[in-house]
Amino acid sequence: LFARYGIPVPAGHVASTPEEAVDAARRRGGAVWVVKAQVHAGGRGKAGGVKVVKSVADVKSAAAGMLGQRLKTKQTVAEGLPINQVYVETGSKIERELYLSLLLNRDTGRIAFVASQAGGMDIEAVAAKTPGKIIRVEVHPATGLQGSHCRALAFGLGLKGEQVKQFESIARGLYKLYLECDCSLVEINPLIVTGDGGVMALDAKINIEENALFRQKELLAWRDPSQEDEMERIAGEADLNYVSLDGDIACMVN
């Protein structure tokens, strides 16, 4: 989806078995690969869902260790989410890790870019402990994204020269994706500066507004029920709103 909107990403392939993971690594070539558990949650790296490996044998071992298991992160339910597939991509040389996201500010009715030079980390913790590291630029829907918005973000992230142009292209692609795909959140963490000075999205998360799924047929076809809470899924099929919580104490308020 990112590639469709002109946002550079590492080349890679999805694999459902360790053998497919090995085949993916060989097709990509190189000397370093990253094996990523495909679950609908952030925080995979800290939970062991992202492995950097330097041999095809280790690609197979990493995939075998993930597939069929459940991954538990701060963003999953207590029992974690099943790992049915892994993504094998070419390793990238990372000079800097940045953060970039796009969401709606419901208070102002504007679309907000949130960025930080502290990428690759828990952004909520960064915002709580060092709010000065968070950059916010809001875009009025009537005027749309302007070059000044992009430059303010790029300079705030410490980008220079050609990197600013690359970033503007990424920001414009992100903004277009956000609008056309009816997103409630698009997050890149990390957005990296590569060894040759390029800018690339290394990992991402996209949330689609559920009330708009009726006009997002292609994205709806990608939905994976195994990554959803079963009770929430059943309630949704009955057109009911239900939020699954841990524990056995509840409060009903009218």
Regions found by a protein language model. Give the residues of each.
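ATP-dependent carboxylate/acyl-activation modules
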Residues: L1-E187, I192-N254
